[in-house]
Amino acid sequence: MIEVIFLGTGGIKPTPERNVPSIAIKIGGEIILFDVGEGTLRQMEIARISPMKIKRVFITHFHGDHYLGLPALIQTMSLWKRKDPLHIYGPEGSSTFLQNLLNSGYFAPSFDILVHEISGKSRLKFKEYEVWAFEVSHGVPALGYVFKEKDKRGNFNLKKIKELGLEPGPWMKELERQKIIEINGKIVRLLEVTGPKKRGAKVVYSGDTEPCDEVIEFSRRGTLLIHEATYVNEEDRKDSYHTTIEEACEIWKKSKARKLVLFHRSPRYSFKEYKEKALSICPQAIIPRDFDRIAIEGAGDVLFKIR
């Protein structure tokens, strides 16, 4: 199971009601951050998320509301004597922007900070998950991300085991490790005695973007699409590099992702006003507040939890 935690759901600037963008994904004992707007450290304290559990941070682009929370996060990690390296991933220019941040004050981190500039073709593989990057359209180098939980093996099939003349026992753990073993003179393969694989969750985060086909393509068969919907309607739009609620809903329908989350709300709207208008346009959408959580069991059940 993974858990998606919304640390900041607004865009552009904080309001008394919500902070700027940051999303945490919890898998096992690890926390992965996507965007770190100013004030994210305080949001983490409220959500009871330890900075020490963060191994990787993914930045969509370098507008302030998406990355200015990094200095406070890094300095707190150092204050707590962190030794493990921190990996930060982002688009073209990441190394320069982050080095400038680290040089802006009397501060030296207690751990290595490894910056990875990635492109829209990057596919990063880790122990329990993968992260894919794709290019979006925001007027500056900008990425969206796919978080893909690795598929799990199917359950042991007792009927198949007995058909091989075997009984359940300790050998099953050895088979899990080795994938193929010899038992009682028989070669047994893990795939022969287990059911179909359980598909892992697929969470897609658009970052800031105007409508673009890449989001649709990378969201196909997704479990959850988190798409920016800065403006309620076309009349409110201030620029051409953001998305309206109606546009985000159309993108979701084309992608056939299971669930849609509308994110990065303009500070001009109260939560109540935005939610009412959003649900009148796209009744199936999830509109989270800061600190709301979504639990996902594989590619199946999606449980939205109000804080």
Swiss-Prot record:
It is an enzyme of class 3 (hydrolase). Binds 2 Zn(2+) ions. Its cofactor is Zn(2+). It comes from the Archaea. Keywords: Endonuclease, Hydrolase, Metal-binding, Nuclease, tRNA processing, Zinc. Its EC number is 3.1.26.11. The keyword Metal-binding applies. The active site is at 65 (proton acceptor). The keyword Signal does not apply. CDD domains: RNaseZ_ZiPD-like_MBL-fold (cd07717). GO terms for molecular function: 3'-tRNA processing endoribonuclease activity; zinc ion binding. Zn(2+) 2 binds at residues 65-66, 208, 264. It catalyses: Endonucleolytic cleavage of RNA, removing extra 3' nucleotides from tRNA precursor, generating 3' termini of tRNAs. A 3'-hydroxy group is left at the tRNA terminus and a 5'-phosphoryl group is left at the trailer molecule. Zn(2+) 1 binds at residues 61, 63, 138, 208. InterPro entries: Metallo-B-lactamas (IPR001279), RibonucZ/Hydroxyglut_hydro (IPR036866), RNase_Z/BN (IPR013471). Gene3D superfamilies: Ribonuclease Z/Hydroxyacylglutathione hydrolase-like. Zinc phosphodiesterase, which displays some tRNA 3'-processing endonuclease activity. Probably involved in tRNA maturation, by removing a 3'-trailer from precursor tRNA. Belongs to the RNase Z family. Homodimer. This is Ribonuclease Z. It comes from Pyrococcus horikoshii (strain ATCC 700860 / DSM 12428 / JCM 9974 / NBRC 100139 / OT-3). The gene is rnz.
